[in-house]
Swiss-Prot record:
<comment type="similarity">
    <text>Belongs to the sirtuin family. Class III subfamily.</text>
</comment>
<feature type="binding site">
    <location>
        <position position="44"/>
    </location>
    <ligand>
        <name>substrate</name>
    </ligand>
</feature>
<dbReference type="GO" id="GO:0070403">
    <property type="term" value="F:NAD+ binding"/>
</dbReference>
<feature type="binding site">
    <location>
        <position position="212"/>
    </location>
    <ligand>
        <name>NAD(+)</name>
    </ligand>
</feature>
<keyword id="KW-0520">NAD</keyword>
<dbReference type="GO" id="GO:0017136">
    <property type="term" value="F:histone deacetylase activity, NAD-dependent"/>
</dbReference>
<dbReference type="Pfam" id="PF02146">
    <property type="entry name" value="SIR2"/>
</dbReference>
<feature type="binding site">
    <location>
        <position position="104"/>
    </location>
    <ligand>
        <name>Zn(2+)</name>
    </ligand>
</feature>
<feature type="binding site">
    <location>
        <position position="131"/>
    </location>
    <ligand>
        <name>Zn(2+)</name>
    </ligand>
</feature>
<dbReference type="InterPro" id="IPR029035">
    <property type="entry name" value="DHS-like_NAD/FAD-binding_dom"/>
</dbReference>
<dbReference type="InterPro" id="IPR050134">
    <property type="entry name" value="NAD-dep_sirtuin_deacylases"/>
</dbReference>
<dbReference type="InterPro" id="IPR027546">
    <property type="entry name" value="Sirtuin_class_III"/>
</dbReference>
<keyword id="KW-0479">Metal-binding</keyword>
<dbReference type="GO" id="GO:0036054">
    <property type="term" value="F:protein-malonyllysine demalonylase activity"/>
</dbReference>
<feature type="binding site">
    <location>
        <position position="128"/>
    </location>
    <ligand>
        <name>Zn(2+)</name>
    </ligand>
</feature>
<dbReference type="InterPro" id="IPR026591">
    <property type="entry name" value="Sirtuin_cat_small_dom_sf"/>
</dbReference>
<dbReference type="GO" id="GO:0036055">
    <property type="term" value="F:protein-succinyllysine desuccinylase activity"/>
</dbReference>
Length: 230
């Protein structure tokens, strides 16, 4: 949101106001109208490319620089963390920049388009170089499970961390919503950063209410001072 990317729960505008993202982002929708779904994702990819990392992304990168091991687990499918300079980023729901074959699931490649996408354009998906199947976005669609190796990596990181900072999550989308509870159960301190109180009342839990850009910037500056003080 603070980078200018609307959430799924925001009202879309223009052509896409007539299409529910939760219906477009399914395997069924892709089978029935691949050109519509592919056009939707290319349009979204174009919107993402216009966005810039915000102060929250930059603060997380700075924390990694001053604290050593900082891993980022994100539900976002954009590349703003990477463009901010973060290296250890795990995308639970996949990445918009990494398509794969709908038939054989082999990773594919899509060239970066410099032309401005027309909103609502119907675009035929490119083909897989191995089986000639249609390429689909490399993201987790509604009704699909997370990739097992990705979820396994996320669990390993959460179970072994000292501190988990949970930023902006609604607590609705599972299994990602379970990660703070898992960290608490393993003895980690959990810091919630949100505009509303989402804490669960655990003794090793901290609730920071406000915008992620402001709170993470202050937290990064505070940690830097503490770590660099004599």
């Amino acid at each position: 949101m603070e980078s200018g990317i609307p959430t799924y729960r925001e009202k879309q505008t223009g052509f896409w106001a007539c299409h529910n993202p939760e219906r477009l982002e399914t395997a069924k929708a892709f089978r029935e109208n691949p050109s519509l779904v592919w056009g939707w994702y290319l349009w979204r990819r174009q919107q993402f490319s216009k966005a810039q990392p915000n102060a929250a992304h930059l603060a997380l990168r700075e924390m990694a620089g001053s604290m050593g091991t900082v891993s980022i687990i994100t539900q976002n499918i954009d590349d703003l963390h990477e463009r901010a300079g973060s290296v250890d980023v795990l995308h639970l729901h996949g990445s918009l920049s990494k398509p794969k074959c709908f038939a054989c699931h082999r990773p594919g490649m899509v060239r970066n388009e410099s032309a401005i996408m027309e909103e609502g354009a119907l675009i035929e998906p490119p083909r897989c170089t191995r089986c000639n199947g249609k390429l689909r976005p490399g993201v987790v669609w509604y009704g699909e499970d997370l990739l097992p190796d990705v979820w396994k990596s996320a669990l390993s990181l959460v179970k072994s961390c000292d501190v988990l900072i949970s930023v902006g999550t609604s607590g609705i989308v599972t299994p990602a919503a379970d990660l703070p509870n898992i960290a608490l159960a393993c003895g980690a301190t959990v810091i919630h950063v949100n505009t509303v109180d989402v804490g669960m009342g655990a003794p090793n839990e901290i609730m920071l209410i406000g915008r992620a850009t402001q709170i993470l910037s202050h937290l990064s500056a505070f940690l830097s001072r503490e770590l660099n003080s004599p």
